[in-house]
């Protein structure tokens, strides 16, 4: 074996959800929003000066950072923007998880966590959920190199109450705690209010689910200015121009249309609750979803059989 072959960093890659090449598919596997982005995005597209694409975008994403900060009542220096929440989370792993102690995350959770840990050679321990698929806060009170968990969790769709989230943060004030809130807009209370209370917490969110902009790749997080500066320092060490002009422009329009955002989220939540009722009548059981999907099982029909029948019906 050649020396370079021995030195290749080998990881088990994250497998993204299937993206069907055919049209007219009812696509459920990656939890995308069924509604289009705000009409203001379309208006922004019509106003866009194509000749501006010859210019590099703003490396600090100033206008989008300001729009996000203003919407959520934060300061600009408390906001970091990346190319989707995956990019933000990856930067967080690289920036803050550098201890020889293991980071902690749930054993049933977002599968990208272990991929990043392997890629960056970060030791980790997966913490089991309880019998009802809930995160057990006490499992995160032990010595560690950092903590990350989704809330609501994926794929369980279960929300952990904010007081329990705060308990985890309280017991880990010497390390960074990342709360991954990709689905928070569909239920529960954000941990954002804890950003001004604790110096070690980062709250990560995305435009992909509730804002109908998965194709634009916009993610962001909130944290104290020292953490945000560290993230920007690492980002600029890789690529100063991570966010393109189109995403910046469309992202600003999305943030500024609160009425449309709340309308779409409300419709999705109503559909979810109706689906729960219908699924129960059909013999399905599931945890109480606070996301835009339902983690369901059937007492007599296997998941494989359901999957195959849905595929046959172009789902």
Regions found by a protein language model. Name each.
Residues 29, 223, 295-301, 312-315:
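Conserved PLP-binding active-site segment of the aspartate aminotransferase-like
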């Amino acid at each position: 074996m050649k020396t370079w072959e021995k030195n290749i960093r080998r990881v088990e890659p994250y497998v993204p959800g299937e993206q069907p090449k055919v049209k007219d598919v009812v696509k459920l596997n990656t939890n995308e929003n069924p509604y289009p982005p705000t009409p203001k995005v379309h208006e922004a597209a019509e106003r866009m000066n194509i000749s501006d694409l010859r210019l590099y975008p703003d490396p600090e994403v100033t206008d989008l950072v300001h729009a996000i900060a203003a919407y959520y009542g934060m300061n600009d220096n408390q906001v970091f923007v990346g190319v989707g929440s995956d990019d933000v989370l990856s930067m967080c792993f690289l920036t803050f998880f550098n201890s020889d102690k293991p980071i902690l995350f749930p054993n049933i959770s977002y599968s990208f966590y272990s991929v990043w840990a392997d890629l960056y050679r970060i030791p980790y321990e997966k913490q089991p959920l309880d019998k009802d698929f809930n995160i057990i806060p006490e499992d995160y009170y032990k010595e560690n190199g950092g903590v990350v968990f989704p809330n609501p969790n994926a794929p369980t769709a279960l929300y952990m109450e904010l007081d329990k989230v705060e308990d985890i943060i309280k017991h880990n004030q010497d390390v960074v705690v990342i709360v991954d809130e990709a689905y928070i807009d569909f239920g529960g209370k954000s941990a954002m209010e804890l950003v001004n209370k604790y110096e070690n917490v980062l709250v990560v969110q995305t435009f992909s689910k509730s804002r109908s902009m998965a194709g634009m790749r916009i993610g962001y997080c909130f944290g104290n200015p020292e953490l945000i500066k560290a993230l920007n320092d690492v980002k600029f060490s890789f690529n100063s121009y991570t966010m393109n002009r189109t995403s910046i422009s469309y992202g600003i329009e999305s943030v500024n249309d609160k009425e449309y955002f709340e309308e779409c989220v409300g419709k999705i939540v109503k559909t979810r609750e109706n689906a729960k009722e219908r699924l129960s009548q059909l013999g399905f059981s599931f945890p109480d979803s606070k996301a835009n999907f339902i983690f369901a099982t059937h007492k007599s029909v296997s998941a494989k059989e359901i999957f195959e029948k849905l595929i046959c019906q172009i789902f």
